[in-house]
Amino acid sequence: MAAGADGPLLFCYDGSEDAKHAIERAGGLLASRHALVLTVWQPTALLGSFAWSGATANMVDYVALDRAAAEDGGRVADDGVRLAQGAGLEAEPVTIKAAGPVWETIIEIADSHDAAAIVMGSRGLTAVSRMLLGSVSSAVIHHADRPTLVVHRPSDEGAH
């Protein structure tokens, strides 16, 4: 689905410094727009034979871990909303559990809300993603059918 120019801006927010910078910089450029601050959380994977071992007491721990991840995702999204509002955007949180790759979830949410554009930092929280253009941002760039803004942080933390 192609983007609607009047749709909200979709800010992808995971709490990383890159995501914070993206909201601050892009929010300043696009102030007064309606924005959704999306936090995608991933469920705890049930690995290998453990998932089929019948150890239901341990599976309850996975449910608790997923519940905690969902709650944490909500807090992260709320933090992103506060940043977006501070940058002049009319923002609301969206928190969702990934049913597959995070980039697919981002595109699905952008489509379902007819987002005018997707805005994200270049790298996320993981050490591996800091080595490259983040795999999520790279996949979104290549698969999104709407404008996508990837905001890079200055290499010198003191530079603006």
Which ranges hold each PLM region?
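Structural beta-alpha unit
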Residues: 1-4, 79-118, 156-160
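Glycine-rich, Arg-bearing micro-motifs that act as flexible, cationic patches
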Residues: 2-6, 103, 117-139, 143, ...
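Small/aliphatic-rich secondary-structure junction motif
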Residues: 2-60, 89
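Short, solvent-exposed amphipathic alpha-helices that sit
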Residues: 25, 72-80, 105
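Solvent-exposed polar/charged
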Residues: 28, 111-112, 142
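General small-molecule cofactor/ligand-binding pocket signal
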Residues: 36-38, 92-96, 149
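Short, hinge-like loop/turn segments at secondary-structure boundaries
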Residues: 53-56, 110-112, 136-137
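A short acidic, glycine-rich active-site loop
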Residues: 58-75
